[in-house]
Amino acid sequence: MAAITASMVAELRAKTDAPMMECKKALTEADGDLAKAEELLRVKLGNKASKAASRVTAEGVVASFVGGNAGALVELNCETDFVAKNDDFLAFSKTVAELVATQNPADVAALSALPLEGSTVDAVRLALIGKIGENVSIRRFVRFETANKIATYLHGARIGVIVEYTGAEEQVGKDVAMHIAAMKPVALSSADVPAELIDTERRVAEQKAAESGKPAEIVAKMVDGSVQKYLKEVSLLNQTFVKNDKQTIEQMLKAANATVQKFALFVVGEGIEKRQDDFAAEVAAQVAAAKQQ
């Protein structure tokens, strides 16, 4: 049997990015044949990726890229906040954001099929899963292409904003993007707030007003007032500017001779149900299963 040297392990690790112990095991199994060991590792990493691919990804990052007249915002998910800080994961997320901006894929499936590093985006993603041992997924993206200006803002890589705007001052775009990250509006103006959100708010207001015991006409006014207040709170233009509580965003934009055409806001894991492991329940289930054997 061929002797497995440290230099052989290092060479295999450099080629595959696999953990040192995995490289040594593969070389041992391949009797020192580097090419065969590399093939074995790729199979093992693929299997590892397959096992991880079914696990919930509620952590992750938001990445952005702006180049020329296009900009993109992407959300990539992983399983733990530890991996969300991994250099390889972060580098992959930035690459994906750039691909979205420059290649204009129609959806996540089209993005995954784009060429990358001599393979495809999805193949690189699977290799990353094999390397870090956690599921990694590209959840969503948005792309703006415009003759206007584009600003982006990332808050700790967990909140991301992209804004299309007009105006001479770039600081305006940065300020608006930062404000959106802080105040999380759901629409540009009151007229843009989705009808289902308004209906929900109206039902809640009606239930609260009905409990007041006041006359119907007063109740109706209370409901309308609550809905109008809600619309102001969740529409960007009506919100109070976080850097100047004497101005609304609309007033700030007017003073700067600027306008906002549209924006997108991503919050990592938004809407994903994160698995909460119950250790006691897991042990109880294992004990019960053992008794049935």
Swiss-Prot record:
Source organism superkingdom: Bacteria
Keyword Transcription: no
GO cellular component terms, semicolon-separated: cytoplasm
Compartment(s): Cytoplasm
Signal sequence, renumbered to the chain: none
Keywords associated with the record: Cytoplasm, Elongation factor, Protein biosynthesis
Pfam families associated with the record: EF_TS
Region (Involved in Mg(2+) ion dislocation from EF-Tu): 80-83
Nucleotide-binding recorded as keyword: no
GO molecular function: translation elongation factor activity
InterPro entries in the record: EF-Ts_dimer_sf (IPR036402), Transl_elong_EFTs/EF1B (IPR001816), Transl_elong_EFTs/EF1B_dimer (IPR014039), Transl_elong_Ts_CS (IPR018101), UBA-like_sf (IPR009060)
Family classification: Belongs to the EF-Ts family.
Function statement: Associates with the EF-Tu.GDP complex and induces the exchange of GDP to GTP. It remains bound to the aminoacyl-tRNA.EF-Tu.GTP complex up to the GTP hydrolysis stage on the ribosome.
Protein name as it appears in the record: Elongation factor Ts
Organism: Burkholderia cenocepacia (strain HI2424)
